[in-house]
């Protein structure tokens, strides 16, 4: 057994009772190792073997589609593999076919601009095939890790000041994002909770304490990785009990709660790991230990045993 495995023992996994037929997997900090955008050989093998075994493998990430599919290009996934992106706002197949999308109300987005201005970086993502599909204001003021993000995404970014001018009622808007230091995003979250628009959008937090970086995704009301996974399962006729979700951060929390089997990565923060027992999550190996592969291998084995028993 992997040294970091706690609740995700053979007995703990078998206690899920139902074979897994749909698994949603986060990318950063889960499928991907730290400081790398390359899926490990063992994880690649497990993904393909899961698909071959009849398990629907879905990727569920805060990244947008344009920054998700290229990282999976060499893995060999099926063209119809669902990619849940923008923290649940958009689901497309790996080949790009739209499966599901929920848009953010531009009026709400414009209202949030005034609430967040002056605290970190504000970004809005548009649903359009051509670049630029990101809108930012005051790029020159962006520093540190966020400046590196801006530089790597520069061809996709339109700089508009004030940013509200890019958010007309005719705009197809996917999500907003606020990003900055941990303290800045604590302040941003405080403002959002007390603003006039509270209750008309979702605010989903992702935190990277080691980098003093936090991201608040501003999504349409009711949208999350959880909602996207639930809609996908319903569309495929797969019961909740037959689903698994694997993740490592706060934006995975609701998805882990909803899935029949929620698996928290061993590299998650201590605060999240402490929640696992009361939330009923399994705690698996870390991303550097190919935790995704470990759990997929268990799911494949359990499914094979269940199908074998059914044939007897």
Question: Where do the model's predicted regions map?
Answer:
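Short active-site oxyanion
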Residues: 54-58, 79-81, 174-175, 241-242, ...
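Active-site phosphate-binding/coordination module
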Residues: 38-148, 267
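Non-catalytic pre-domain segments flanking phosphatase-related domains
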Residues: 1-25, 48, 52, 311-312
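Residue-level signal for inorganic ion chemistry
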Residues: 50, 87, 176, 256, ...
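Conserved acidic, metal-coordinating active-site core of Asp-based
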Residues: 119, 126-244, 250-252
């Amino acid at each position: 057994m992997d040294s970091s495995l706690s609740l995700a023992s053979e007995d703990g996994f078998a206690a899920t009772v139902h074979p897994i037929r749909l698994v949603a997997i986060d990318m950063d900090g889960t499928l991907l190792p730290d400081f790398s955008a390359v899926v490990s050989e063992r994880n690649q093998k497990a993904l393909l073997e899961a698909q071959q075994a009849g398990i629907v493998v879905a990727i569920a990430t805060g990244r947008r589609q344009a920054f998700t599919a290229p990282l999976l290009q060499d893995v060999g996934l099926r063209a119809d593999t669902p990619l849940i992106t923008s923290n649940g706002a958009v689901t497309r197949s790996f080949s790009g076919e739209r499966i599901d999308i929920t848009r953010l109300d531009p009026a709400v987005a414009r209202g949030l601009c005034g609430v967040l201005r002056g605290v970190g970086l504000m970004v809005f993502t548009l649903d359009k095939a051509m670049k630029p599909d990101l809108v930012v204001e005051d790029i020159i003021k962006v520093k540190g890790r966020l400046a590196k993000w801006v530089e790597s995404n520069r061809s996709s970014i339109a700089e508009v000041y004030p940013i509200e001018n890019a958010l007309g009622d005719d705009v197809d808007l996917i999500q907003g994002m606020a990003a900055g230091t941990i303290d800045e995003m604590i302040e941003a979250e405080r403002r959002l909770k007390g603003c006039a628009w509270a209750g008309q959008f979702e605010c989903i937090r992702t935190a990277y304490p080691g980098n003093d970086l936090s991201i608040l995704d501003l999504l349409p009301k009711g949208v999350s990785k959880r909602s996207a996974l639930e809609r996908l399962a319903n569309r495929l006729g797969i019961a909740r009990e037959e689903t698994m979700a694997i993740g490592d951060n706060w934006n995975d929390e609701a998805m882990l709660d909803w899935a029949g089997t929620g698996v928290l990565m061993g590299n998650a923060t201590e605060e999240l790991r402490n929640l696992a027992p009361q939330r009923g999550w399994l705690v698996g190996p870390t991303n550097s230990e190919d935790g995704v592969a470990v759990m997929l291998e268990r799911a494949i084995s359990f499914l094979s045993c269940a199908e074998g028993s059914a044939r007897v």
